[in-house]
Amino acid sequence: MEAKAVIYAILDFDGEKTARLVRAHLDQGADAREILDQILIAAMDEVGRQFSSDIFFVPEMLMAAEAMQAGLEVLMPYLARSEIRAKGTVVIGTVRGDIHDIGKNLAAMMLECAGYNVIDLGVDVSKGKFLAAAKKHQAHIVALSALLTTTLTEMEAAVSDVRARAGGTLKTLVGGAPVTASFAAEIGADGYSPDAAGAVAIARNLTEAVSK
């Protein structure tokens, strides 16, 4: 049975078929970790590429992530939880004063599907809560989202707080409609992504930097 069949099922948003094919791979002796890394995560990478190319949009990304989740649920009994979350821990939230969560939720889902342990703090999150959660969960990355231009100062304050109190051991990733690459660089963020799909690739780079 080819891995492509599972990937196509995810790209077709067919969770039932995805789960059935993953189960068939396991029955044939396939390694659960390899199914996760080489099939399910590879499928979400392709979803990210199609989103970046304007082939998929937010609804398609959500449906693909749900299909992937159906396959992941089949794998769960075959994988220790620590193995599934081996890529790192990300604390994510929308900064204080901003209650918009669509972009943040999508980024959280994409990161989780890519194998990260995601601690979602929700919206209107103060800089202190970001840092406290990061320390509590021994996070590798703090991801901050903002939709309102008026809350960019809160994002800057939170990034500065992480840099001042956590040093280089904790990376920051920022994004949201009013956020630009130049603004991210200006406030000292370690990573910037213009969309949820790109957040996964940036997170990988940041976690690799931390582990070196």
What are these regions (language model features)?
Residues 41, 96-98, 178:
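Short glycine-enriched loops at secondary-structure junctions
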Residues 1-83:
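Long amphipathic alpha-helical segments
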Residues 57, 99-100, 151:
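Alpha-helix N-cap/loop-to-helix initiation residues
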Residues 107-114, 119-189, 195-204, 208:
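Cofactor-cradling patches in redox/metallo enzymes
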Residues 18, 94, 149-151:
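Ser/Thr-centric signal marking residues that sit
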Residues 85-121:
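Glycine-rich active-site/cofactor-binding loop and its immediate structural neighborhood
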Residues 85-86, 207-212:
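Non-catalytic signal-transmission and effector/linker regions of two-component phosphorelay proteins
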